[in-house]
Amino acid sequence: MIAIVVSVFMWLLAACLLVLRRGRAERNITYAALTIALATTLNIDVVYRTLDALAGGVNLVTLLADLTLMTGVFFLGRGVARASENQPLPIRFALSPVALLVALGLAITAFALIERGVTTTTFMLDLGTQSAAAAYSAIQFAYYGIVLAAMAVLGARQVQISAGLQALSPGVLVAGSVCGIFLSIVVIAMDLAHLSGNLALMTAIDLAYSPLYLMTFLFLCLGFASGPATRTVRAHSRERTARMLSVE
């Protein structure tokens, strides 16, 4: 159910951005919305089972969905970076293609070492006792956490130099990024608890997963949609004011 809700959020965001950002040269945010929407759609159970059966029934769609999501998060970070100047070196590296390629390479390597068995829609729950599976998940969420931390820093800087409605979009993005950082920490903690056999701890930590997952995507969607929406409203307001002045 959560996968469906998040997928709907992301496709709505993609549709909004395609309309509101029409004609703009900067496309990173639109690419991010489309790739993340695709990744979340691949994680819907019925879609996953159907496609994985076509791919041989060995959970290859898990890898496809996860690599797509990592790429989408990369585009998110690049989109935020384009709106900021004088970025520190650690932030530039965190949001660079090199960091993405390193993370993708590590994730693919870890995935190849997992004894995956047949199709399962609860991949980490079923296979999380394998060290390769724990590493595979941790690599992804470490990358997400790093990118989102960089986004939070850039967003906070943007809030400081903005006023009124202009501060809304970066402020909501900071909230989404912070939720995503905590989500990454929660997932890595769950991976370690599962790997160590402490299922009680894993279950306790899991209580935070769904709320953080939903809040992360909700705030990020609102943040990225509110930016172009605010600019559109302001543009219409300026046009209306100009017409009124010309009539006078």
Task: Please report, for each region that a protein language model flagged, where it lies by residue.
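Alpha-helical transmembrane segments of multi-pass integral membrane proteins
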Residues: 21-42, 134-191
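Short aromatic-rich membrane-water interface segments that cap or initiate transmembrane helices
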Residues: 56-68, 127-142, 204-211
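C-terminal transmembrane-bundle signature of multipass membrane proteins
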Residues: 149, 168-248
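Hydrophobic transmembrane alpha-helical segments in integral membrane proteins
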Residues: 1-11
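Membrane-proximal helix-loop-helix units in multi-pass membrane proteins
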Residues: 104-146
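A generic, lipid-embedded transmembrane alpha helix
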Residues: 29-51, 65-74
